[in-house]
């Protein structure tokens, strides 16, 4: 599957619009970007092993770990990795859903959720409000 950078960017924007806005509006000083593949530093930081892929990465200090002196800092960064997301997607719908799922996963890290909690929430049936 191939996709232009512009089309990938549009899908990220749509996913941002479709995610619960209380979580999106709570993002403060966070850059959301994409790259084709993780660089060496990102791969090392994520513990990426040969044959594994990385869909996204949150780099920053989660809200739950920030103290009163947390000021004048560079933005946190959420990176989505286009080539990896394309590899696990089989059509346009699955591509969009994977972008949205990966974006939500990395935003959850911003809010301080660890992988166990994120996976628990992903498996839970949706609630009706």
Task: List PLM regions with ranges.
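Short alpha-helical catalytic segment bearing the HExxH-like zincin motif
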Residues: 98-106
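Auxiliary alpha/beta "docking" domains used to position bulky ligands
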Residues: 122
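Active-site rim/adjacent substrate-binding subdomains
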Residues: 1-98, 110, 114-117, 125-129
């Amino acid at each position: 599957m191939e996709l232009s950078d512009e089309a990938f960017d549009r899908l990220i924007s749509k996913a941002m619009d479709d995610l619960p806005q209380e979580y999106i509006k709570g993002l403060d000083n966070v850059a959301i970007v994409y790259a084709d593949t993780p660089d060496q530093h990102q791969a090392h930081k994520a513990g990426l092993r040969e044959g594994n892929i990385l869909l996204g990465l949150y780099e920053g200090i989660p809200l739950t770990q920030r103290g009163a002196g947390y000021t004048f800092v560079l933005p946190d960064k959420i990176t989505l990795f286009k080539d990896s997301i394309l590899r696990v997607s089989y059509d346009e719908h699955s591509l969009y859903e994977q972008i949205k799922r990966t974006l939500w996963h990395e935003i959850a890290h911003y809010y301080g959720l660890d992988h166990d909690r994120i996976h628990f929430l992903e498996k839970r049936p949706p609630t009706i409000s």
